[in-house]
Design a protein with these regions (language model features):
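Short, basic/aromatic beta-hairpin or loop at an interaction surface
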Residues: 16-30, 72
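Non-catalytic beta-sheet/beta-sandwich ligand-binding modules that flank or precede catalytic cores
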Residues: 9, 77, 109-115, 192, ...
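A short beta-sheet element
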Residues: 29, 33, 38-101, 120
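A short glycine-rich beta-alpha junction/loop motif
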Residues: 72-77, 111-138
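Non-catalytic DNA-recognition/assembly elements of restriction-modification systems
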Residues: 1-8, 184-208
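Short helix-capping and inter-helix turn/linker motifs at the boundaries of alpha-helical repeat units
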Residues: 68, 115-119, 173-175
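Amphipathic alpha-helical segments
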Residues: 92, 128-166, 177, 183-198
Length: 209
């Protein structure tokens, strides 16, 4: 399904197309000493996968990440693989990053080093993986991508709601010596009363009614 890619940047791709594998984003603020050093970077095309070996609670042996954002370049420290068969982009994005599926494969095709795992390419390429038809791949990939979009939408709504709450906490309580808040419900116009906290609670005694 995949072959190791060692295609290097010929210098025509600049740092504006540098891809951060961990977050799968273009990141152009990385300092590169010379144009020649740029040529040590691998080309990282749409649909390629790269191995990111940092171990975590979620990914015990590291993980693969698929490039789903567009053609670019990545540091030569990453192992890059290119698909050699017809496939669905979204299906493989989720399959190759699925710890439940990949843990047994990576357990046999990586070796531990300090704080991370190194991929043994030949061992990885000799592993097997259950694959549905391309038609079924497309349906699975589209469904999972739709769920991701829904999650993103709800996360944005959640952040907007948190900002609204913070704003209303400032506006619905009197500020800076004022006796009334800036925002009130209809029907309330009187000043808020200044009270001692001790006036608002009775003493609670333990052990008895």
């Amino acid at each position: 399904m995949y072959a190791r890619s060692s295609e290097k940047n010929d210098g025509s791709i600049g740092m504006d197309k540098n891809i951060t594998v961990a977050t799968m984003q273009f990141k152009n603020d990385v300092k590169v000493s010379t144009t020649e050093y740029l040529k040590t970077y691998y080309t990282f095309k749409l649909g390629d996968i790269a191995f990111e070996g940092h171990q975590s609670k979620e990914f015990r042996y590291g993980r693969f990440v698929e490039n789903d954002i567009g053609n670019g370049i990545v540091s030569h420290i990453f192992a890059v693989f290119r698909p050699i068969q017809e496939y669905d982009l979204y299906f493989w994005k989720y399959a190759i990053n699925n710890e439940t599926l990949m843990q047994r494969i990576l357990a046999r095709s990586t070796k531990a080093s300090t704080m991370m795992h190194d991929l043994v390419t030949n061992d990885f390429l000799n592993e097997t993986f259950l694959v549905p038809s391309v038609k079924e791949q497309k349906q699975i990939g589209a469904f999972l991508n739709k769920l991701d979009n829904l999650i993103t939408l709800h996360q944005r709504k959640c952040e907007q709601t948190k900002k609204l709450k913070k704003y209303m906490l400032q506006k619905m309580f009197p500020q800076n010596g004022a006796k009334v808040p800036e925002i009130r419900f209809d029907g309330f116009t009187y000043d808020w009363e200044q009270r001692k906290l001790g006036d608002e609670a009775e003493e609670i005694l333990a052990g008895g009614d």
